[in-house]
Structures are given as structure tokens and as C-alpha cells.
């Protein structure tokens, strides 16, 4: 059962209608696969979620209590290779007879979401309204971001790999670029697990096939990084958002232009390489879970508990800037004496109520309107949603001292 891309040997990308038919046929052909619609775009196209497990996919509740891997497949509509890699991997897992992979699927649910069908059809980075969905994971203004965040909230993945493409240039021309969450509010253990997956599993899998790999956002000369041009700690980007909600998340990017004369002469060769690299990165994430399933389940739960306790006691530090390897440089970018919560007016709460529900942020009514405590698993995210020091806050909240 080949994808249209495979049938063309890389000469033509799978179209969105073709993918809908392919997934329908895959669902019918394998008991391991379940395809569901988890949202609709403003042009009424389905946002489809593919679940794969053995002997059949677990229910949402059972999966959330166990082990889940989530792949977001080309949130930027003009970055085709992530979608193709996801279609192929879903098919391969559905029909695998490999004993180790079959055991893996008995214990872990693998999810694939095609989040931007409008951009897919239009061949645009953004959605139909021109919004970059990968800058919308805080405000959740788009149906595409809302669908992804709802999947994260309800299925509770242990790991996430966000598949993209990049335009190569001088000092920035490896087959794969990868990155972990860099936001400084991410739990340190979750940060380290995500970095381990990024470097020691996904990148390692790619390089084991003879491809090159580097860190996203870093220009490199003579083997040494000398300038950062992207890849910061913005919470509104998925790899950072994932870390803030206690998921070991990472970014995968493959070069979308020719890297040698052979690819320059043969677009189908270029396209196949793009897909192979993203597929290999995704396979690395699968291997991370195969080898560390129990550890990941334990540490995601422990991270949620650590955040809740820090929010209760007011210990730790809250950051509004910086990244994992760079501390803030200004007083208004950091809070060394954290608040215990935020006071919202009734009107503000009405404005953000649905958004908070999608983020899994809880609150309680009080005399001032609504109180959002930091004593919950989303402690690292909440100040970024409401504090005046947060560049991308979604509403105004008043910090409440402990």
C-alpha cells in the first residue's frame, strides 16, 4: 500500500484529498489504525488524527494513562516532507511484522496529526488566514493550534516530534536541523529528556544513515557554531510549549533545497531525501520510547508534580526571557520571588475561559473575579499567559504574592 508520493518515486507530493483517501483506506485495511477528525479549518477541511496501536489503538483515556508518541506532520503547509513521512510511518507501523515494533505498539499509542490542510492545499506556510500556526500555541486563535493543544491535553503524550523543513544557506546546510525546548520555565528533567531524544536518538538515527545533522538556528563554520539566528525560547512555538506542559518535545527540520549536484539535477531525488530525513528523525523518537517508556511515563508525571509544588510554595524562579543556555540580562525579564497565582477580572476570565480550558489551566471563582493558582502542572506557562512582562501574554492578570 503505497502513498501517491511513493508511487511517483518522489516526483509529486501527495495532495490533501489523496491523503484523506489514503488514510481512509489504511483505516479500513488495518485494525491497528483509527482515523478521526479532531477539528475543522475555517474552510471546513478536516484536521485528522491517526492513532496506531496493537492489536488496536487504545482508547484516549487508556492511552493517556499509558504511553503516547505524537508527531505533528507539517504544520507549515508548504513543508511537504513531514506529511509524507507521517503517512509512510503510519502505514509501516500498521503492517509491521517486526516483533520489537509489534510489542512497542502493544504498549504505546502512536499519533500523527496533519494540522494545516488549508495551507497544504494552498501551498502556503500559514493557514488560510495567513497565520503561522507555530506562533499560536499560547493565544490559540486558530482552529489548527486549538486542535493540536487539545490533543496534547487529552492524550497526554510523553514525547512529541514536530516535523518541518528549512531553507539552507551558507553555514546552515545540513540534511537535518533539530532542537529541544529552550524556554527556561521548562522542568529541567523534561528539558534534558527532550534534548537526549533530539541529539542521541533522532539526530543519531539520521546520521547513522549517512546524512548530516546540526542544531537548529546555529550557523556553523569549521565545525563550530558562531551565531544563533533562530531557535529561542518563545512559549508560543510548539517545541517550547510542549516542554512547558511536561512533554519531551523537539523540532525536526530538513533542508528543502538541493544540497548537492545530484539533487539539483533531480527534484525527485531531493524530495525523497527530504522525506527520508524526517522519517529517520521520527524513527529516532520511536526508539527513544522503546528504550525509555517507563522512565518517560514516570518523569512526565514527576515534572507535573514538581511544578505544582513549586507553584504552591513560591519557590524557584519564573523567567520571561532568555533560553536554556542564556540567562536574562534585564530585571524585568525574570522574577526571583515568584507569585503564587494571578487574579483575573470576571471580564478577563470570560475572554480567556475557553483558551485556558484547552491549555488545561484551572482556576476558581473569588471576590475579585477569578484566581489562577500556579500550584498546577502548567506553572511554567501561566505567567507567560498573564504577566505584563511576558511579550506574548494573552490577557492582563495581576500577580498575587505567596
Language model regions located:
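M14 metallocarboxypeptidase catalytic domain recognition
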Residues: 1-402
Amino acid at each position: 500500500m503505497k502513498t501517491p508520493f511513493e508511487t511517483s518515486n518522489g516526483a509529486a507530493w501527495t495532495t490533501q484529498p489523496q491523503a484523506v483517501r489514503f488514510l481512509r483506506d489504511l483505516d479500513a485495511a488495518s485494525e491497528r489504525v483509527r482515523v478521526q477528525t479532531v477539528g475543522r479549518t475555517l474552510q471546513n477541511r478536516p484536521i485528522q488524527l491517526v492513532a496506531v496501536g496493537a492489536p488496536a489503538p487504545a482508547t484516549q483515556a487508556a492511552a493517556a494513562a499509558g504511553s503516547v508518541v505524537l508527531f505533528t506532520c507539517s504544520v507549515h503547509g508548504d513543508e511537504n516532507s513531514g506529511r509524507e513521512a507521517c503517512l509512510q510511518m503510519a502505514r509501516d507501523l500498521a503492517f509491521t511484522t517486526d516483533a520489537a515494533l509489534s510489542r512497542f505498539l502493544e504498549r504505546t499509542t502512536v499519533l500523527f496529526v496533519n494540522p494545516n490542510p488549508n495551507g497544504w492545499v494552498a501551498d502556503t506556510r500559514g493557514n488560510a488566514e495567513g497565520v503561522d500556526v507555530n506562533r499560536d500555541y499560547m493565544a490559540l486563535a486558530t482552529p489548527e493550534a486549538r486542535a493540536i493543544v487539545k490533543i496534547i491535553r487529552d492524550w497526554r503524550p510523553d514525547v512529541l516530534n514536530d516535523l518541518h523543513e528549512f531553507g539552507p544557506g551558507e553555514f546552515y546546510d545540513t540534511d537535518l536541523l533539530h532542537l529541544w525546548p529552550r524556554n527556561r520555565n521548562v522542568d529541567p528533567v523534561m528539558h534534558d529528556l527532550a534534548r537526549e531524544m533530539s541529539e542521541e536518538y533522532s539526530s543519531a538515527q539520521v546520521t547513522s544513515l549517512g546524512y548530516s545533522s546540526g542544531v537548529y538556528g546555529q550557523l556553523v563554520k569549521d565545525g563550530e557554531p558562531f551565531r544563533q539566528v533562530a531557535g529561542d525560547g518563545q512559549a508560543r512555538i510548539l517545541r517550547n510549549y510542549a516542554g512547558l506542559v511536561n512533554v519531551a518535545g523537539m523540532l525536526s527540520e530538513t533542508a528543502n533545497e538541493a544540497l548537492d549536484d545530484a539533487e539539483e539535477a533531480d527534484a525527485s531525488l531531493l524530495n525523497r531525501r527530504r522525506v527520508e530525513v524526517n522519517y529517520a528523525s521520527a524513527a529516532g523518537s520511536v526508539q527513544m520510547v522503546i528504550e525509555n517508556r517507563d522512565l518517560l511515563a514516570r518523569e512526565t508525571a514527576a515534572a507535573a508534580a514538581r511544578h505544582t509544588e513549586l507553584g504552591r510554595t513560591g519557590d524557584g524562579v519564573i523567567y520571561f526571557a532568555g533560553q536554556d543556555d542564556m540567562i536574562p540580562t534585564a530585571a524585568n525579564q525574570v522574577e526571583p520571588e515568584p507569585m503564587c497565582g494571578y487574579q483575573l477580572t470576571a471580564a478577563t476570565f470570560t475572554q480567556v475561559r475557553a483558551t485556558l480550558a484547552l491549555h488545561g489551566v484551572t482556576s476558581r471563582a473569588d471576590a475579585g473575579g477569578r484566581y489562577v493558582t500556579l500550584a498546577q502542572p502548567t506553572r511554567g506557562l501561566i505567567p507567560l499567559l498573564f504577566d505584563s512582562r511576558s511579550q506574548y501574554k494573552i490577557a492582563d492578570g495581576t500577580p498575587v504574592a505567596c
